Amino acid sequence: MTDTDVQAPKIEFPCERYPIKVIGDAGEGFADLVVEVIQRHAPDLDSSTLRLRDSRNGRFLSVQVLITATGVEQLQAIHLDLRATGRVHMVL
């Protein structure tokens, strides 16, 4: 491996306190929608980890939660379902 080769960090599953940040248009029910979608795949979601942040101009809202990630398949399913809502711009 050379100095220019960068490898993504390995995640060991299950991974407790795995952060998921979702950014979408601010609007009524956006945070509830995000939590609902994530809870389908991570029923043990602790709502006390929910963090909301408005963008500077108030147009966007970021919703961050911590889950216990059980595997890549779970994370991919969460991402796909969030994008399918049509209200999500980014999932980090």
UniProtKB/Swiss-Prot annotation:
One Pfam entry name: DUF493
InterPro entries linked to this entry: UPF0250_YbeD-like, YbeD-like_sf
Top-rank lineage group of the source organism: Bacteria
Coiled-coil intervals, chain numbering: none
PANTHER family in the record: UPF0250 PROTEIN YBED (PTHR38036:SF1)
NCBIfam families: PRK00341.1 (NF001486)
UniProt-listed HAMAP family: UPF0250
Protein name from the UniProt record: UPF0250 protein Avin_08440
Lineage, uppermost ranks: Bacteria, Pseudomonadati, Pseudomonadota, Gammaproteobacteria, Pseudomonadales
